[in-house]
Amino acid sequence: LRLIRKLKSDAAAVQRAVRGNINTRLLANEFETYNELLYSINELIEQMDRLQVQAHRSETARKKLLTNISHDIRTPLTSIIGYVDALQDEHMDTQQEKEECIAIISAKAQTLKELIDHIFQMAKLDADEIEIRREPLDAAELLREAIISFLPELKKHGMDLAVQIPDEKCTAEVDRYGYIRILNNLIKNAIRYGKDGRKLGVELERKETSIELTIWDAGPGIPANEIPRIFERTYRSEQSRSLQYGGSGLGLAITKAFVDKHGGRISVVSKPYERTAFTVSLPVRMAQPVSVKR
């Protein structure tokens, strides 16, 4: 019961924060696991405070971004509050019902943590605090490892996986963290939007001066008029793509920023329920790190 009361109190506090009370902070308690989420949310509130004073952003873009972030915070918080109330309902008798509520609360908390992570990444990229450290890595092996980490989620959604990766080493000078971030963001994006189509594909090709990574899904796709803006951090689809399927909308902007830092290119082509493919081309040998245009 103490944890339930704490959840409700903290959820209300975060709602005050996203309405503009940036002085709000959450206090730790004896629940160690829960404290990890509290720490992340406090960091998020501080980051929102910093976002409000970043001079390099236009006022319109800044307000739009903060509006999107506020909405993305409120959505899982509303669910958390609702299910916490349900846990307190004296008519909820069965252990199964309680476990289902706890599972949903956990999933919504994970959504919050993902949003927080994206905001931190974007802030670090804006401040040029992420250094690209080049080293010869086997891009194919790192891709295989990324795929393995997503197999449980693919199985959960009943998605078929098509993989085309060279058997031999595919060495390229890339930043390990940045490359893995690109892989994870694009695979996660394909699962999120492609699960209705039940298919996901991953392809890697070694060319003379570059490696070419393609990750595709057979989901509803992206309208042609929206593709030019799909990598903008403040952009939301007219068809509420991000709102319908979840996600902050920042993942693709972060992916493009890492691709740009590698001196690479990213593109997308989309045919609804056939193939929506994101293709990343990274140079095998990197020149000096590239500054990201803000």
Feature-to-residue mapping (PLM):
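A conserved beta-strand-to-alpha-helix junction within the catalytic ATP-binding
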Residues: 133-148
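Short helix-loop "hinge" at the ATP-lid/N-box region of the Bergerat-fold HATPase_c
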Residues: 190-191
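Short beta-strand/loop element within the Bergerat-fold HATPase_c
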Residues: 197-209
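Acidic ATP/Mg2+-coordinating residue in the GHKL
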Residues: 217
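Short conserved segment of the HATPase_c
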Residues: 222-234
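Conserved catalytic submotifs in the C-terminal HATPase_c
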Residues: 133-137, 155, 160-170
